[in-house]
Amino acid sequence: MMRALGALALALFASAPQSPTPSPTTHPRPPGTTELPLLPTSPAPPPTAPIDRQRGVALGMFAEDVSFSYGPLLAEIVAVGATHIALVVPLYQTDATSHDIGLHTRLSPTLAALAEVARAAKRDGMQVMVFPIIRLSSPGPGQWRGTLAPRDRDAWFKRYGDLLGELGAVAAVTGATRLAVGSELSSLESDLDRWRPVVERVRAIFPGKLVYSANWDHYRSTALFDLVDEEGISGYFNLRDAAAPADDATLDAGWRRARQEIEAWRAGRTHPFIFTELGYRSRKGVTAAPWDEGAGGTPDIDEQRRAFASFRRVWSTAAGLDGVYIWNWYGYGGLGTTSYTPRGKPAEVEVRSLLGAL
């Protein structure tokens, strides 16, 4: 299932970009969805705050079709006002106890494809962060990347370190400015004796900033922050109880609580702080459990929009915030979908306003 990585793949990075392939918007749409025209792509208004922040959007490299072109998505991300982009690279292992982690032959991009998209994003004027995440192909009950417990920890860290080295090489040769050394690995974050050589190896390969992304419910105890340059949090905070209304006042109160908690934790800390993921599915109830990736639910494009608007109202003027990455641009928009992407939905307007206000 996993693709071997090595010098042969690295040689592909220097190759000239392939000619453009068909736009992703020409691919078949999921059944039962409604096409919405993309919202106007005129340049976003200039930022109103003088703070030099990462105005970012995450782009999942999730296409299974090898002919898929990310170029049109990059153009949309620039048009919505992003100055930074996180290229999300899914890595796979069998379950939480395995150490067979690697790039999936069908569900992960090749290193050459990652390099091509990173170069294209840089040509479009964006700063690039390479952002690996771990997914489980056959998870047991309750398992996800936050509960990893490999039977052979040494083998897992060796393999993961090899992968980060390969991704760091791509990031270096393409001029990326940031590399995430991990995301939401809550059960492994305290193992600094194994993390330290991994991070040191990556630093020898990649000259840019290293980031770690902690889960929204685990950031206070993340010892791994001590080894990196920027502290990230995936911003899936519950903004309300399931029985509470999803109105502006309730959502703003939820974000104010989260902001107070984060700012109390940040007191005395010196590393830059960013939201590495800020995303909401377009379905009813999303603001009560933004982290819930489960399929199904009732589409609700307005609750998604209100969630982004609430974040803008509460956080856009926060002096201690160094950046935000919207999760996630990949995917089709439309009235019949419940996905995270804001493309072609009312949330796209709010994302434009949010990035412009940072």
Predicted features by range, described:
Residues 32-77:
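Boundary/entry segment of secreted carbohydrate-active catalytic domains
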Residues 36-51, 290-296, 303-308, 314, ...:
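Aromatic-rich peripheral "rim/lid" segments of glycoside hydrolase catalytic domains that contact
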Residues 58-64, 98-111, 149-159, 182-189, ...:
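The substrate-binding groove and active-site-proximal loops of carbohydrate-active enzymes
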Residues 63-79, 102-123:
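Aromatic- and glycine-enriched glycan-recognition loops and surfaces
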Residues 64-78, 157-170, 215-224, 305-314:
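Short, acidic/polar
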Residues 80-99, 112-188, 283-286, 327-332:
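Substrate-binding cleft and catalytic face of glycoside hydrolase catalytic domains
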Residues 110-111, 116, 123-124, 131, ...:
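Glycoside hydrolase catalytic-domain groove-lining segments
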Residues 163, 188-212:
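Active-site neighborhood of glycoside hydrolase catalytic domains
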